[in-house]
Structures are given as structure tokens and as C-alpha cells.
């Protein structure tokens, strides 16, 4: 599998710590007139990122109370449940959320934050069987996925 490249972006100074993970939700209306908005909004909406390095560059920000700090990020792996027949290391999968049972104890693993429906991912690791029985009777495996 190809090595993941880092990207420089801006995040709220309070969040700017190596190892912090976040899901990029897109541009805020307050960003409209900002001169550095391209540096903040250069990530993929709905994807999970991990901060690798914090840089010394700091900017005032209308969104973040203590301003924004430059960081290097990479897309972070996400743990989720998928159909057991798709759970093969290095296989490419297209994520489709077919269950809407919000009361299910595994719901957050079947529809995790940081995964975009319809996009392709690579199964990086198979972590084992689902800890709970699927309410729809499906055979599920817990896997770690990365963007394809």
C-alpha cells in the first residue's frame, strides 16, 4: 500500500496537538472573507484526519477563539464493521451504509464518523468478529480502513 502523504492545513490552536484526530466538516460562513481560507479548507469533507506535526505559524481566526495554527495532517484510519465476506486485508471496498437502526449498540461502528458513503477504502487490518450480534442477522467483522 502506498505511503500516506501529509498535508498542511490550519486548525484551531486548542486542537493543535500531535495525535489529535478530527473529522473535517467543511467551510464555515465566517471563512468567506478570510485571506487564508484556502489553507484551512484544503481537506476532504467528511474524512478523518490525524495531526502529525504542529508548526509555529499562527493566524487570527473568526471561527476559533484562540486563532488557528498550521499543522501537518494525514488521513487517519477508521475502525468499522463491514460484511465478513469483504473483510480481507488490502482489498478495496466501496462503503455503503445499509442499516439505519440507530438504537443498535453497533450503530456507531457500522456508520462511523470519518467515513464517506460511496467512497472507496482499503481494508488495512481485520481486527476480529463483531462484539455484538447484528440486529439484521449479518455476519460482520471489525476492520481498520484507510482511503483508497
UniProtKB/Swiss-Prot annotation:
Can you tell which superkingdom this protein's organism belongs to?
A: Archaea
Any coiled-coil ranges, and where? none
The Swiss-Prot or TrEMBL record describes its family as follows:
Belongs to the UPF0179 family.
Against PANTHER family, the record matches this protein to:
UPF0179 PROTEIN MJ1627
Looking up HAMAP family in the UniProt record yields:
UPF0179
What is the name of the protein in this document?
UPF0179 protein Mboo_1959
Organism in which the protein naturally occurs: Methanoregula boonei (strain DSM 21154 / JCM 14090 / 6A8)
Amino acid at each position: 500500500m502506498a505511503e500516506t502523504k501529509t498535508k498542511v492545513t490550519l486548525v484551531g490552536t486548542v486542537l493543535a496537538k500531535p495525535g489529535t484526530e478530527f473529522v473535517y466538516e467543511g467551510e464555515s460562513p465566517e471563512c468567506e472573507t478570510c485571506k487564508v481560507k484556502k489553507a484551512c479548507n484544503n481537506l476532504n469533507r467528511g474524512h478523518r484526519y490525524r495531526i502529525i506535526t504542529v508548526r509555529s505559524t499562527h493566524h487570527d481566526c473568526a471561527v476559533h477563539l484562540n486563532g488557528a495554527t498550521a499543522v501537518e495532517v494525514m488521513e487517519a484510519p477508521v475502525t468499522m464493521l463491514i460484511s465478513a465476506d469483504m473483510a480481507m486485508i488490502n482489498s478495496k471496498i466501496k462503503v455503503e451504509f445499509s442499516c439505519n437502526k440507530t438504537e443498535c449498540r453497533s450503530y456507531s461502528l457500522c456508520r462511523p464518523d470519518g467515513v464517506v458513503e460511496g467512497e472507496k477504502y482499503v481494508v488495512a487490518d481485520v481486527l476480529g468478529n463483531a462484539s455484538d450480534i447484528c440486529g439484521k442477522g449479518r455476519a460482520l467483522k471489525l476492520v481498520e480502513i484507510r482511503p483508497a
